[in-house]
From Swiss-Prot:
It is found in: Endoplasmic reticulum-Golgi intermediate compartment membrane; Golgi apparatus membrane; Endoplasmic reticulum membrane. The record marks Q501 as: Required for ER export. This is Protein ERGIC-53. Its main location: endoplasmic reticulum. Residues 44-267 form the L-type lectin-like domain. It is a single-pass type I membrane protein; Single-pass membrane protein. One of its GO terms (molecular function) is metal ion binding. Residues 499-510 are cytoplasmic. A carbohydrate binds at S88, D121, N156, H178, G251, G252, L253. It comes from the Eukaryota.
Length: 510
């Protein structure tokens, strides 16, 4: 009975997965986004001299290899507490050597935890020409030359737009506007809550072909690759050589700002030769490392022999639990199909975010161009008419609305898939079937919205035609209305008189 139920679930997953892939191919097939993802990916090379990760993060003297910490930063074996949960604390950690990468990527894993509903002040990830060991900008120095990604948890300007992630660049001559949270200096931003999450928050910062992109994993799931788009800055010019760093600060309110890992990768464009490896170690160092390896290998063999002598009952037992049954294999395939659907939906959600960002930028630039042409050249011949430009702007707004609707629909689908992965034991089959039906309905909605979006885009140059007004219905005449009011009043007075007589007759018996 259980095997038939699993086969039924698997039969439902396969057509749903095919429908999802069909919808994705129709959406991304036109502009080449859905091509081979590995064709244009850059080559990634891990740079250990600009990275740290636990365990055994610190040495015996309390220092972190290749890094320098300052202020109230506290390194430990598995993390670096950049700023503790005490008032008015500042701390930072910086690479000792400068990085000379044309393109790079960093993955930072951190936690920001506190007992209050509101935190302060926040954490910052830096790439600057010089080290800012201590200062007023999230624990680092002001007037930096480079870029900073600020995880601001306190609302200084009172606009209720925090916690937020803000990208701010500087050429070494601009003071940070701390009172307004750098709103006038921000190149891009997004609102994400990164405090008190069940899992560590992960930030992926990519600088590739002069474009800075920030991806965020909010820490709601243990999936390390569950990133979503946050912000992007094009034509970003940063110093050719610089230091990577992390800083944090507290004010009247205090949070613990812990950095668990900082991983740096050098990126090389496809078609170019990857960077040359570092110089090989000398023969003397090789012999030293070989002796240490042999010593550790002998100790391991000795420990194995001691364990086998002390636990003879654990030897020679058959490992039957290693092999899975037919039912377990079918259930695993069902869950793998669900996970693939979940990942595809996440990918589509990220692409929709990026398209929405591009459309907003295009609409803003088009609106500015319309205002300039309307103010400077109102009577010039040969230009596009104001009505046609308004039609284009309205079409772009309609596209934005359709994309938002698709995004909401995909979010609802993700919620259903997450709930489907934990069905109840008693009514699991019925609830799972119901979830599949809901997911199919949402996928059809997304497909229909995409078709409408394509049709609206093709017909955007045509002039819109207003529909004809329906015939105006006949209204109630004044005479009929007066007659109706008089009849209703007479009936109401008669009812009151009848009720009074009944109450008077009832009082005679008492």
């Amino acid at each position: 009975m259980a095997g038939s139920r699993r086969r039924g679930l698997q039969a439902r997953v396969r057509p749903l997965f095919c429908a999802l892939l069909l919808s994705l191919s129709r959406f991304v097939g036109g502009d080449g986004v859905g091509g081979d993802p590995a064709a244009g990916l850059p080559h990634r090379r891990f740079e250990y001299k600009y990275s740290f990760k636990g365990p055994h993060l610190v040495q015996s003297d309390g220092t972190v290899p290749f890094w320098a910490h300052a202020g109230n930063a506290i390194p430990s074996s598995d993390q670096i507490r950049v700023a503790p949960s005490l008032k008015s604390q500042r701390g930072s950690v910086w690479t000792k050597a400068k990085a000379a990468f044309e393109n790079w990527e960093v993955e930072v894993t951190f936690r920001v935890t506190g007992r209050g509903r509101i935190g302060a002040d926040g954490l910052a990830i830096w790439y600057t020409e010089n080290q800012g060991l201590e200062g007023p900008v999230f624990g680092s120095a002001d007037l930096w030359n480079g870029v900073g990604i600020f995880f601001d948890s306190f609302d200084n300007d009172g606009k209720k737009n925090n916690p937020a992630i803000v990208i701010i660049g500087n050429n070494g001559q601009i003071h940070y506007d701390h009172q307004n949270d750098g709103a006038s200096q921000a190149l891009a931003s997004c609102q994400r809550d990164f405090r008190n999450k069940p899992y560590p928050v992960r930030a992926k910062i990519i600088y590739y072909q002069k474009t800075l992109t920030v991806m965020i994993n909010n820490g709601f799931t243990p999936d390390k690759n569950d990133y979503e788009f946050c912000a992007k800055v094009e034509n970003m010019i940063i110093p050719a050589q610089g230091h990577f760093g992390v800083s944090a600060a507290t004010g009247g309110l205090a949070d613990d700002h812990d950095v668990l890992s900082f991983l740096t990768f050098q990126l090389t464009e496809p078609g170019k030769e990857p960077p040359t490896p570092d110089k090989e170690i000398s023969e003397k160092e090789k012999e030293k490392y070989q002796e240490e390896f042999e010593h550790f290998q002998q100790e391991l063999d000795k420990k194995k022999e001691e364990f086998q002598k002390g636990h003879p009952d654990l030897q020679g037992q058959p490992a039957e639990e290693i092999f899975e049954s037919v039912g377990d294999r079918e259930l695993r395939q069902v869950f793998e199909g669900q996970n693939r659907i979940h990942l595809e939906i996440k990918q589509l959600n990220r692409q929709l975010d990026m398209i929405l960002d591009e459309q907003r930028r295009y609409v803003s630039s088009l609106t500015e161009e319309i205002s300039k042409r309307g103010a400077g050249m109102p009577g010039q011949h040969g230009q596009i008419s104001q009505q046609e430009l308004d039609t284009v702007v309205k079409t772009q707004h309609e596209i934005l609305r359709q994309v938002n609707e698709m995004k909401n629909s995909m979010s609802e689908t993700v919620r259903l898939v997450s709930g489907m992965q934990h069905p109840g034991s008693a009514g699991g089959v019925y609830e799972t079937a119901q979830h599949f039906a809901d997911i199919k309905e949402h996928l059809h909605t997304v497909k229909r919205d995409i078709d409408n979006l394509v049709q609206r885009h093709m017909l955007s140059n045509e002039k819109p035609k207003c529909p004809e007004l329906p015939p105006f219905p006949s209204c109630l005449s004044t005479v009929h209305f007066i007659i109706f009011v008089v009849v209703q009043t007479v009936l109401f007075i008669g009812y009151i008189m009848y009720r009074s007589q009944q109450e008077a007759a009832a009082k005679k018996f008492f």
